[in-house]
């Protein structure tokens, strides 16, 4: 019995050591979440009454949207749209990207659409050869696979995405950690009953309006949340997509509603983590996007791409034990999407390296 007790103590000590941060920081886990194509305007200014009044033709839907999301006060609008972001992250973390207050975040790639944006975010630099949304395996080393090779992270890294192109962006042929996207079923050895049900359900959906390359964010959320509970990853990436789909269709009411729902998804994940010792006070959450969109004045609020003015401007939010609670950032140095990968690795205790030089760590995000 004494020998067994000794073994348990040694094992517990090894477990604690394997999760310790090489830089002495408190962060042991990271959750990265992206909301595809969500404009900085809605994040910081809330719903735009001009788009509601002039874009929503159905009177009933227009009135319902005004009632749900429009308030005269700017802070009330944004708090109502994204309550977790503005009540929790803003009080204990940092939010970047409000151009009206001197906080600018932008892409370094010149394309302003998804694959180049996600490449920049995950690998830490712009690659001129990544210039389409085609299903081409990404040759660049990303921060997920970088961390998957570190002590204590092997098979503790995972990615879930609504858009199936992530299998190519993250490169599932080169990497063996869990990557699940689009209408592809989750093929892990260990599955919960809900994940088995999702596997059957995801292949039966018609995906009207999206095409077969995008699944509902509700499915992505349930896949990822179940994986989090079962597998306890140390680095989890979740990429939601429906915000971009509704914006392209210029369905502003649905666009606002999905932003509100995604905020609730993020809140549920954060709340769950606070009730578990592995994650509580040891986890950094980062929320950002892959590209911006045009503005109302130009008539391009639903569009993005090289030809769309201001589609390069994005935003980011962060909360965790190593991040000062400065709230909404104002009059800051300009930051870029290419800096997020190095910042994530640094928070986990490592100096990120890829196959090319990468963006620098956002020092303001770390104490």
Predicted features and spans:
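Active-site His/acidic residue clusters
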Residues: 172-173, 222-268
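Bacterial Sec-dependent N-terminal signal peptides
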Residues: 1-25
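Acidic, His- and aromatic-enriched active-site or binding-groove loops in soluble protein domains
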Residues: 123-136, 176-210
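Long, well-ordered early-domain segments
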Residues: 69-168
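Histidine-centered active-site microenvironments of extracellular/periplasmic hydrolases
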Residues: 54, 288-319
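Active-site-proximal N-terminal segment of extracellular/periplasmic enzymes that hydrolyze or transfer
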Residues: 20-94
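Non-catalytic, well-ordered alpha-helical segments in soluble enzyme domains
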Residues: 148-151, 322, 331-366
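Metal-dependent active-site segment of extracytoplasmic phospho-/sulfohydrolases and closely related
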Residues: 31-32, 40, 262-302, 344
């Amino acid at each position: 019995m004494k020998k067994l007790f000794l073994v348990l103590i040694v094992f517990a000590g090894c477990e604690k050591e394997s999760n310790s941060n090489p830089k002495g920081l408190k962060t042991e886990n990271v959750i990265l979440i992206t909301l595809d194509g969500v404009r900085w305007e809605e994040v910081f200014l809330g719903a735009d009454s001009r788009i509601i009044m002039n874009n929503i033709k159905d009177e009933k839907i227009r009135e319902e949207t005004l009632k749900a999301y429009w308030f005269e006060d700017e802070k009330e609008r944004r708090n109502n749209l994204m309550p977790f972001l503005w009540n929790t992250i803003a009080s204990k973390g940092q939010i970047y990207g409000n151009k009206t207050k001197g906080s600018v975040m932008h892409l370094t790639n010149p394309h302003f659409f998804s694959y180049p944006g996600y490449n920049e975010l995950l690998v830490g630099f712009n690659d001129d050869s990544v210039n389409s949304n085609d299903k081409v395996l990404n040759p660049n080393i990303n921060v997920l696979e970088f961390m998957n090779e570190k002590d204590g992270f092997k098979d503790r890294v995972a990615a879930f995405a609504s858009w199936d192109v992530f299998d190519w962006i993250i490169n599932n042929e080169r990497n063996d950690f869990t990557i699940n996207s689009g209408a592809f079923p989750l093929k892990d050895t260990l599955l919960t009953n809900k994940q088995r049900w999702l596997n059957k359900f995801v292949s039966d959906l018609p995906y009207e309006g999206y095409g077969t390359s995008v699944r509902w964010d509700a499915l992505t959320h349930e896949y990822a949340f179940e994986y989090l509970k079962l597998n306890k990853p140390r680095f989890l990436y979740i990429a939601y997509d429906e915000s971009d789909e509704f914006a392209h269709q210029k369905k502003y009411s649905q666009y606002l509603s999905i932003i509100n729902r995604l905020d609730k998804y993020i809140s549920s994940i954060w709340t769950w983590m606070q009730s578990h010792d592995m994650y509580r006070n040891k986890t950094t959450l980062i929320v950002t996007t892959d590209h911006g969109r045009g503005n109302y004045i130009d008539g391009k609020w639903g569009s993005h791409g090289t030809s769309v003015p201001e589609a390069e401007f994005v935003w980011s939010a962060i909360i965790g034990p190593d991040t000062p609670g400065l709230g909404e950032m104002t009059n800051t140095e300009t930051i870029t999407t290419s800096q997020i990968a190095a910042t994530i690795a640094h928070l986990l205790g490592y100096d990120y390296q890829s196959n090319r030089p990468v963006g620098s760590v956002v020092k303001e995000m770390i104490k």
